[in-house]
Each structure stands twice: as C-alpha cells, then as structure tokens.
Amino acid sequence: NPGDTCYFDSSIPHGMIAVGGEDCEFYAIVLNPTGASIPELDPMRYTPVAREMKSKTERPGIWQKWIDIETSGTGTPTKIEFKNTENFNFAFDVVDEIGKTQPEKLAMLHLSSDKTERRITFADMMKESARCANYFSSLGIKKGDRVMLILKRHYQFWYAMIGLNKLGAIAIPASNQLLSHDIEYRINTAEISTIICTSDGECADEVDKAAPSCPSLVNKLIVGKKREGWRDFNEEYPRFSSSYKRSKDSPKGDDLLLMFFTSGTSGYPKIVAYIHKYSFLH
C-alpha cells in the first residue's frame, strides 16, 4: 500500500515490482551505521516512464503453445492454464525452437578451467545436440536406454544431455567423486548401457575398475584426452549430421527423461526418475 516501509538486507539479491496497473515510485534509503556521509548516495531525481504493454501478436513467444494467460483490464495476469503438456520435449520445443527463430541468441557462456571462453548460441546447441543424437543412435543407443554422464562442468555435457533428450535415452548425471564400487552399484541397479566420462582426474580409472562386474555396460565414451579401450567423444560425434528430425515416436510428456541417484545417507542410493513434463515446469 502507498506509504508502506520495508526493511531488508540489500546484500541479498532482490527486486521490486508494481502491480495493479497504477504508476508507482520506489524510494530506496541506505541506512549507514557509521553515520558518515556517502557522496555517491546524493538524492537523485527519478522520472517514471509509462511502459506500454505489448500484445501477443507484437511479441510472440514459444510459451504461447503451452500456456494460456488471462489478464485483467490493466494487463495483470489473473489466470494461467497449461496445455499440450503431453507432447512437450524440452530439446525440440525450447532449444530447437529458439535455435530456429533466434539462432544467434546466446544459450550458454562457458568458461573452462583453463579460462577458455566459449559463446554457445541456440543454433549451436540445436546442431551439436543433433549430432550427438545421431552419434548415440549409431552406437546402438535407443529410446529407453540408460546413459550415465560424469562430465563435471564440461560444455559437452549439454550437447550430450540434449541429444539424449531428442533420442529418448534416459540421462543419469553423476558426480566425478564416485569410486569404483559406487559406479558398479549404479550401473547394475539402473542397467546402464553407456557411460560418458571426463578424462580429468581418476574418474575413468574408477569406471574401468567397475566395468568387468557390469554386464549391461556396452559403450564407454571419453571426453578430453584419448584413452585406450574408450571411444573418443570429441573426435567422433562431430562427424554426424547436424539435423535430427522429430518423429511420432520421439519422447514427450510422460516418457522418462532423467534419473538421479539419492545420496544414500540412510541406505543404498535409490533411483529418482523424472519425466519430460519435469523440464516443462521450469
């Protein structure tokens, strides 16, 4: 209400918005416990500028296929309904859609451990994930197969993850701190067929220790340095087509998307599964 006062710790990220359709001015007052003057905080005059509400036809968004919003006469949302969720697939309906309509839009700014900067657009993400989907398919990976990803913060994680989303294989992200017995348990419990692993540290060593006791494991892919007995992900996946078409059998809605293992604090880790609608809620 007009005249209300709110005290808060400004070191915590925050924001303020006006609702109800009326113009509003916010006054921010910094309370300085030392009592000393702060020249940078001299009173400044603020002239509010009226913002014009844009209609859906002026600024269409990919969300309109999935969400209906009712608003009041002042443009304030009053009701939200979701639709078509049974068909939703994040890789096709968000990543690829933006890749087609806004190809140069930045999807991710990645800074590697050696300070190499990569600016990855949605067009890049669309094409590289398609290459991954085609690559994985060539290895015999299919819809419903389980694939473990131990990739730390490598940018290849996102190419592989979205490629698996398109293919319909179930991604199982895992920590690079797992030891051989942890890996063996997860592979056998989830019947994992493929593992994509970083060459950093001793992760691949731990996988190789576990592999002989894991009959379901067929493919081992390494990201980074080459390793005997492993397929070279960085070298092989770029050879494949950057186009991957959606089909009537492509994963969607209630199909499985992800599996995570719990921490196992009170017993053996358990599988928590998520469907494609999970990413829709984000």
Regions found by a protein language model. Give the residues of each.
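Ligand-binding loop in jelly-roll beta-barrel domains
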Residues: 10-36
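Conserved AMP-binding A3 loop
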Residues: 118-123, 257-281
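Conserved AMP-binding/adenylate-forming core of the ANL superfamily
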Residues: 104-162, 179-184, 235-238
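Conserved pre-ATP/AMP-binding loop-to-beta segment of ANL
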Residues: 103-106, 222-231, 238-261, 268
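A short N-terminal helical cap/helix-turn-helix that marks the beginning
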Residues: 53-68, 84-108, 127
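Short acidic-glycine-tyrosine-enriched beta hairpin
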Residues: 2-9
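Structural core segment of the AMP-binding/adenylate-forming
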Residues: 54-58, 138, 162, 166-235
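AMP-dependent adenylate-forming
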Residues: 71, 94-121, 225-228
